[in-house]
Amino acid sequence: MIFSTLEHILTHISFSVVSIVITIHFLTLFLLVDEVVGLYDSSEKGMIVTFFCITGLLVTRWIYSGHFPLSDLYESLIFLSWGFSLIHMVSYLKFKKRKNNLSAITAPRAIFTQGFATSGLLTKMHQSAILAPALQSQWLMMHVSMMVLGYAALLCGSLLSVALLVITFRKAIKIIGENNNFSFSFGKIQYMNERSNVLLNTYFLSSKNYYRYQLTQQLDRWSYRIISLGFIFLTIGILSGAVWANEAWGSYWNWDPKETWAFITWTVFAIYFHTRTNTNLEGVNSALVASMGFLIIWICYFGVNLLGIGLHSYGSFTLN
């Protein structure tokens, strides 16, 4: 009873704090008042509080349930939110007193995942239950934690690539919207990519353009680093899952929906790294691949659970 109450309290504290953090962050982003009242620093400290609250929540549920809290969709969403908070913590320690643009990605992701986890759709999963026989293995912690951390890092890196594309093609998108012409061929993308590369040489003429160039370079650099980390986690998760599957079901790979989409996700980001090796394809083109990867990850992590079929059906839920 005590652990259940503590878990409930920590859940609401972390959700409330991260909500305040997002509000503060957008105030500092659009009103530019962080230099006056120090709101930006307050939002960073708020994410630290959120990180420790979610950590306490996971530890409490671990003690209360007697197993590592990654047995269903609810627990994995909480762990995913913890992963976003962890990435934010690492970037905060990296930047220290400099402004950290990554918080614009991690904070909304944390509140989105935790908000969905605590919603009425997953009420039946809020109470910890006896671990399913298929999950009673030491591989649970290794496999699922690596996969979820990989999802968290890849989602953050992909959103940074989306932000890069928005900044790069903002004027082109505005023109297309005004003309009500929504056809957007790869030829146009290639043209705009070449045009943007030419414009990079003239950015020094305007301080605003120079700042935009610096921002896109920073987004591209951080996107590559975070996606690299997520790709490593994803690879370890897939390999450990294959070993676990062989022990549990006698086969390393069964091509059920979850495994198939995990392989598709891995392939998409392998293509992303291939584009990074070619100087003519890196930048905008690699960001396009990463942006597609963002959708693929959500299908792999969440969309497949809606099917409720396959060897991973124990983590699924149905919309009533």
Curated annotation (Swiss-Prot):
This is Cytochrome c biogenesis protein CcsA. Pfam families: Cytochrom_C_asm (PF01578). Signal peptide: none annotated. May interact with Ccs1. One of its GO terms (cellular component) is plasma membrane. It comes from Gossypium barbadense (Sea Island cotton). Keywords: Chloroplast, Cytochrome c-type biogenesis, Membrane, Plastid, Thylakoid, Transmembrane, Transmembrane helix. InterPro entries: Cyt_c_assembly, Cyt_c_biogenesis_CcsA, Cyt_c_biogenesis_CcsA/CcmC. GO terms for molecular function: heme binding. The keyword Mitochondrion does not apply. Required during biogenesis of c-type cytochromes (cytochrome c6 and cytochrome f) at the step of heme attachment. Belongs to the CcmF/CycK/Ccl1/NrfE/CcsA family. GO terms for biological process: cytochrome complex assembly. It is found in: Plastid, Chloroplast thylakoid membrane. The chain crosses the membrane at residues 13-33, 46-66, 73-93, 147-167, 226-246, 259-274, 289-309. Its main location: plastid. Coiled coil: none annotated. Disulfide bonds: none annotated. It comes from the Eukaryota. The lineage of its organism: Eukaryota, Viridiplantae, Streptophyta, Embryophyta, Tracheophyta. It is a multi-pass membrane protein.
